[in-house]
UniProtKB/Swiss-Prot annotation:
This is Cyclic pyranopterin monophosphate synthase. Homohexamer; trimer of dimers. It comes from the Bacteria. It holds the Pfam family MoaC. The active site is at D127. HAMAP family: MoaC_B. One of its GO terms (molecular function) is cyclic pyranopterin monophosphate synthase activity. GO terms for biological process: Mo-molybdopterin cofactor biosynthetic process. It comes from Helicobacter pylori (strain G27). Pathway: Cofactor biosynthesis; molybdopterin biosynthesis.
Length: 158
């Protein structure tokens, strides 16, 4: 497969998307943060001194999606139509699963924005609770679904 971010001299370049068609693009990404029971209970019971952890993670995830092109060198700056984040409580494993759905009308997809949104949301949870549990783990950050564009739809294997 040809790497599109390299020119003929094997040097980095940003792909020219000028001739591509503007279409609706949607991406859904997810990831998980696991922690000890004390940290999990502190989040659920709103006992974290830094404030409301899950609400802050949602805001951070939205900000992460908006800042993606500033942090990933070959990522195009695109207008986002919406970012929707859900955080599921997983009591039995003392973890939270974060989903980010990003939508746009553009010439390129929003997979990186969805993945960045998940990553920043989970890192925010870690930051806010690290005083209680430094051994938290972030895992399984992945693209679940994408639609729109020339390459068509993608659904992760379950």
């Amino acid at each position: 497969m040809l790497l599109t971010h390299l020119n003929e001299e094997n040097q980095p370049k940003m792909v020219d998307i000028g001739d591509k068609e503007t279409t609706e693009r949607i991406a859904l990404a997810s990831g998980r943060i696991s922690m000890n029971k004390e940290a999990y209970d502190a989040i659920i019971n709103h006992g974290v001194k830094k404030g409301p952890v899950l609400q802050t993670a949602i805001i951070a995830g939205i900000m992460g999606a908006k800042k993606t092109s500033e942090l990933i060198p070959m990522c195009h700056s695109i207008m986002l139509n919406g970012v929707d984040i859900d955080i599921l409580e997983e009591k039995e494993t003392c973890s939270f699963k974060l989903y980010a759905r990003v939508k746009t009308q553009a010439k390129t997809g929003v997979e990186m924005e969805a993945l960045m949104s998940v990553s920043i949301g989970l890192l925010t949870i870690y930051d806010m609770v690290k005083a209680i549990d430094k051994s938290m783990t972030i895992s399984g950050v992945m693209l679940e679904h994408k639609s729109g564009g020339k390459s068509g739809d993608y659904n992760a294997k379950k």
